[in-house]
Curated annotation (Swiss-Prot):
List of residues binding ATP: 174-181
GO BP annotations listed: nuclear-transcribed mRNA catabolic process, nonsense-mediated decay; rRNA processing
Residue ranges annotated as motif Q motif: 130-158
Ranges of biased composition (kind: Low complexity): 25-34
A Gene Ontology molecular function term of the record: RNA helicase activity
Biased composition (Gly residues): 521-538
Keyword field: ATP-binding, Cytoplasm, Helicase, Hydrolase, Nonsense-mediated mRNA decay, Nucleotide-binding, Nucleus, Ribosome biogenesis, RNA-binding, rRNA processing
Designated name of the protein: ATP-dependent RNA helicase dbp2
Family of the protein in this entry: Belongs to the DEAD box helicase family. DDX5/DBP2 subfamily.
Reactions accelerated catalytically: ATP + H2O = ADP + phosphate + H(+)
Cited InterPro entries: DEAD/DEAH_box_helicase_dom, Helicase_ATP-bd, Helicase_C-like, P-loop_NTPase, RNA-helicase_DEAD-box_CS, RNA_helicase_DEAD_Q_motif
Gene source species: Aspergillus oryzae (strain ATCC 42149 / RIB 40) (Yellow koji mold)
Length: 554
């Protein structure tokens, strides 16, 4: 089945020219075996032996996004002057309304949107679809979707697919874990298969920008899975790892590039790729990218892409900075919002907020873990305010017999990937993280989130606890709140009230007497490493190499 007479790729990776085009020569892409998923971001085969640990790594700079935040990035990129009349034409409108969708009354459509707390803005917005068949995807896409066992589209997919397939610029606002990745991935696959083949030296057709390497790798996994039948090649471009494999992928040619902004600009400045062929641009977690200071890099990257592209922007929130970005780079966009536009937490999450002093935190954390880990299937993600505290808490837990590991921006990429895999598989069901991971981690079955330190703002609180209660499941979020956090009390109570959660009387008192006193931080014990981790070798920082204490707690 071909789409609007475009270029079709069947199971044998053959291509048939359906006319149009404008790009020279139908480059065959050379690789009869297709592409297994883009090299960079894969797992590991070997174990990590060796005796002891070498005391951790020196500071690597970086923070969120692994060193992507460099203010002079992009200075070497030339400003592009676009003459749309001379650019090759491309297809971007593929949506044909299914008869069942067309025959629904407006009342039925309104009730469907109301049921899923869905609001839309813009002109000539297509109606939502209720089944995968109604979306009108080609068979090669539908077969992959059905093979995954999905029963029906999520709310954001129901409305997002018709919008994206129509070729319009799209803004989607939905909570993390709502299925938004597939909302843009499947239309991207259709878009690619309607374009002329890549010629030698061409850059990607689809570019996905993401704030963190963890999220980028997760997006790559989805693209790989659903692009498999049509041999779509991809690569993941992010900092903190050697550039060689990424350069190799780009030079061979990939239809999809998933990237963090800093490393992509590195590649562009070095001439390792170009964005001349990009006709489908995705900004995923746009709010997070702006929070992390990537706006200048995003603007430089977009300046290298033809202005008549299709742009899809996805975000969990809709602050004024994101609205401005949409206004600057999207044309006549249509928008879908799932849930309230006010900052709110997932109602499937039970939120427990305890007002504590700093010196009480460790004992209270242990008591909660004892209860949580009574069920061996549970997983707990613990958030701390700093990398230092993350490492201290991890050592403390491991020495107390708990199978905890930590992840943050100063860990080498190899170690971060290993920790994530240990957590996902349940081998280490407790993971300690900083905010660098608060939106980048996609582990579907996290049952508990524990905020050891309260975040700097309410948006980060909502995103942190959103790691649990995903894909329709229920979850529990436990938060330690101190007098040092009192300025955040009013916003937190608003979120708790909206979600109909119980409120600690001491928290309510902080709101009444807002701004209450300081109360210095209780001193943290210096849980220095004890040397000689078991079989972990010098590949791991001291906190993750600390041996489990003799009193195994799990």
């Amino acid at each position: 089945m071909s789409y609007n007479g475009g270029y079709q790729r069947d199971q044998r990776d053959s291509y048939r020219n359906g006319g149009g085009g404008g790009y020279s020569n139908g480059y065959s892409n050379g690789n009869s075996n297709g592409y297994s998923g883009g090299g960079s971001g894969g797992g590991y085969g070997g174990g990590y032996g060796g005796g002891g640990y070498g005391g951790g790594y020196g500071g690597r700079g970086g923070g969120a996004g692994g060193g992507d935040r460099m203010s002079n990035l992009g200075a070497g990129l030339k400003k592009q002057e676009w003459d749309l009349d001379s650019l090759p034409k491309f297809e971007k409108s593929f949506y044909k309304e299914h008869p069942d969708v067309a025959n629904r009354s407006q009342r039925d459509v309104d009730e469907f949107r109301k049921k899923f707390e869905m609001s839309v803005q813009g002109k000539n917005i297509p109606r939502p679809v209720e089944t995968f068949d109604e979306a009108g995807f080609p068979q090669y896409v539908l077969s992959e979707v059905k093979a995954q066992g999905f029963e029906r589209p999520t709310a954001i997919q129901s409305q997002g697919w018709p919008m994206a397939l129509s070729g319009r610029d799209v803004v989607g606002i939905a909570e993390t874990g709502s299925g938004k990745t597939l909302s843009y991935c499947l239309p991207a696959i259709v878009h690619i298969n309607a374009q002329p083949l890549l010629a030698p030296g061409d850059g990607p057709i689809v570019l996905v920008l993401a704030p963190t390497r963890e999220l980028a790798v997760q997006i790559q996994a989805e693209i790989t899975k659903f692009g498999k039948s049509s041999r779509i090649r991809n690569t993941c471009v992010y900092g903190g790892v050697p550039k060689g494999p990424q350069i190799r992928d780009l030079s061979r040619g990939v239809e999809v590039c998933i990237a963090t902004p800093g490393r992509l600009i590195d590649m562009l400045e070095a001439g390792r790729t170009n964005l001349r062929r990009v006709t489908y641009l995705v900004l995923d977690e746009a709010d997070r990218m702006l929070d992390m200071g990537f706006e200048p890099q995003i603007r430089k990257i977009i300046s290298q892409i033809r202005p008549d592209r299709q742009t899809c922007m996805w975000s969990a929130t809709w602050p004024k900075e994101v609205r401005q970005l949409a206004s600057d780079f999207l044309n006549d966009y249509i928008q879908v919002n799932i849930g309230s536009m006010d900052l709110s937490a997932n109602h499937r999450i039970t939120q427990i907020v305890e007002v504590v002093s700093d010196f009480e935190k460790r004992d209270k954390m242990i008591k909660h873990l004892e209860k949580i880990m009574e069920n061996r299937g549970n997983k707990c993600l613990i958030f701390t305010g700093t990398k230092r505290i993350a490492d201290e808490i991890t050592r403390f837990l491991r020495q107390d017999g708990w199978p905890a590991l930590s992840i943050h921006g100063d860990k080498q990429q190899q170690e971060r990937d290993w920790v994530l895999n240990e957590f996902k598989t349940g081998k280490s069901p407790i993971m300690v993280a900083t905010d660098v991971a608060s939106r980048g981690i996609d582990v579907r079955d996290i049952t508990h989130v524990l905020n050891y330190d309260y975040p700097n703002n309410s948006e980060d609180y909502v995103h942190r606890i959103g790691r649990t209660g995903r894909a329709g499941a229920k979850g529990t979020a436990i938060t330690f709140f101190t007098t040092d956090n009192s300025k955040q009390a009013r916003d937190l109570v608003t979120i708790l009230t909206e979600a109909k959660q119980q409120i600690d009387p001491r928290l309510a008192e902080m709101v009444r007497y807002s701004g209450g006193g300081g109360g210095g931080r209780g001193g943290y014990g210096r849980w220095g490493g004890r040397g000689g981790g078991r079989g972990r070798g010098g590949n791991y920082t001291a906190s993750n190499a600390a041996p489990l204490g003799g009193n195994r707690r799990w």
